[in-house]
Regions:
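Long, structured protein-protein interaction/assembly regions in large complexes
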Residues: 1-215
Length: 215
């Protein structure tokens, strides 16, 4: 977790904020489009407030599956006089892989004023079997978002309610790492921790047990 100081009546109040570190950054994800995703050039990073999360257990090779949910986010985050509902315009799209076409489209939209800010993030991979999927499930329990996949839960079925908790405060995108700051649902986190303890107990190798313990 991270400790943040916020102004209070008497000096500062210290608040415990849960943090989720990710061993991936824009260097691993964005390729030649890195510069278009940077919004804090002084620190060479991207910071998005009140992020939402679209989590996909698969590769994104074209924009078509993304368009329905992107349109929903765009409409919901529009000014109230245009029918918006105050929804966040900041969306983190997490998947196994992004094609050049998808990266180019997201990058071009990111720099356009008045558009939603959707950025890609490749799921980290380790030597553990199905590590992409394990990470996505871990992440989903922290941010409160649904994991989509090509067969049982296609992206076209995504709704605003599938994009995570309102208590996620920020997403920091660095060169080789990322961090989510926010308050998860304690019951979701505890449920996932219990699952991981069970996985560790039946791990087929010492390495697998160690990697599960790390998570």
């Amino acid at each position: 977790f991270t400790i943040l100081e916020q102004p209070g009546v008497d000096g500062f109040e210290v608040e415990q904020i849960e943090g989720f570190p990710i061993a991936r950054g824009f260097e691993d994800t964005c390729g030649r489009f890195i510069e278009q995703f940077i919004n804090d050039r002084a620190n060479y990073r991207t910071v998005l407030e009140k992020p939402k999360f679209l989590i996909y257990n698969g590769k994104l090779n074209d924009m078509n599956p993304l368009m329905p949910i992107l349109e929903k986010v765009a409409n919901a985050s529009a000014p109230k006089e245009q029918g918006g509902i105050g929804f966040s315009e900041n969306l983190i799209i997490v998947a196994h892989h992004f094609s050049e076409n998808v990266l180019a489209t997201l990058a071009n939209n990111f720099v356009q004023p008045g558009t939603i800010k959707a950025i890609p993030l490749k799921a980290p991979i380790t030597s553990q079997a199905n590590s992409h999927y394990h990470f996505l499930v871990d992440l989903s329990h922290f941010v409160g978002a649904k994991v989509f996949d090509p067969l049982s839960a296609p992206l076209e079925s995504a709704t605003l309610g599938h994009l995570g908790l309102d208590s996620m405060q920020s997403f920091e995108y660095m060169r080789y790492r990322s961090t989510i700051i926010g308050k998860p649902d304690e019951m979701l986190v505890l449920a996932r921790a219990e699952e991981l303890y069970k996985q560790k107990a039946v791990a087929e190798s010492i390495l697998d047990a160690e990697l599960t313990a790390e998570r």
